[in-house]
Curated annotation (Swiss-Prot):
A lipid is attached at residue 20 (N-palmitoyl cysteine). It comes from Vibrio atlanticus (strain LGP32) (Vibrio splendidus (strain Mel32)). Its main location: membrane. The lineage of its organism: Bacteria, Pseudomonadati, Pseudomonadota, Gammaproteobacteria, Vibrionales. One of its GO terms (cellular component) is cell outer membrane. Pfam families: LolB. InterPro entries: LolA/LolB/LppX (IPR029046), OM_lipoprot_LolB (IPR004565). It is found in: Cell outer membrane. This is Outer-membrane lipoprotein LolB. It is a lipid-anchor.
């Protein structure tokens, strides 16, 4: 593991994310319970953008693609030169990482595996819900003025994580009407575009530049 971690560290770019281009945010006000029910209906989605990781030990700035479906999730981190820093797949059997030189590493917990290989502490097991703005089993959470999730706190493996959802954007979602299987209805739903995760001195800033989703 230590050898791979050293190799992985060389691939990571030590660039601090100073700022990101602004994204127009025009979220609509929602009724929270109804909104949460709609979020839970989203079975397949993809989010892509930029991720900045800051800790006392390292600072990284990376591109990310997060894909989620009922049977599998995938997180891919790449440098700004296009090099793959992490290619993680999660399914019912556990987590698997395939490295740039085709080495394969597995673990029951995705979060543990990523930390062992890269040193990054990321609560990956909760990302499928947190990315969408669902307070998955949160110890506490707060809503903002538009009744979407503003913040949450969650104890994960004896570590207290706090999340803030700074911005939302209305995102198109295709859904089939019950009366006609071939009739596809396009509706919109506000989804997070700026998120921050904090645990002790570790901080993760995420900017989602593109959402792709469907029920």
């Amino acid at each position: 593991m230590s050898k791979l971690r050293k190799i992985t560290s060389l691939i990571f770019l030590t660039i601090i994310m100073v700022g990101c281009s602004s994204i127009p945010e025009q979220p609509t006000s929602v009724e929270w319970q109804s909104h949460q029910n709609r979020l839970l209906q989203i079975e397949n989605y993809q989010a892509s953008g930029k991720l900045a990781y800051i800790s006392p030990e390292q600072r990284q700035s990376l591109n990310f693609i997060w894909k989620h479906s009922p049977n599998q999730s995938q997180l891919r981190l790449t440098t700004f030169l296009g090099q793959t820093a992490l290619n993680l797949t999660i399914d019912s059997l556990g987590a698997k990482v395939v490295t740039y030189d085709d080495q394969v590493f597995t673990h029951a917990s995705a979060s543990v595996l990523v930390e062992q290989l890269t040193g990054l502490q990321i609560p990956i097991d909760h990302l499928p819900q947190w990315f969408l703005g669902i307070p998955d089993q949160a110890d506490s959470y707060q809503l903002n003025s538009t009744n979407t999730l503003e913040s949450l706190s969650k104890q994960v493996s004896s570590q207290l994580w706090t999340l803030n959802f700074a911005n939302y954007r209305n995102t198109e979602m295709q859904s089939k009407q019950l009366s006609d299987k071939d009739n596809v209805k396009v509706e919109t739903i506000p989804l997070p575009t700026r998120l921050s995760f904090k645990q002790d001195e570790n901080k993760i800033n995420i900017v989602v530049s593109k959402w792709t989703l469907k029920k």
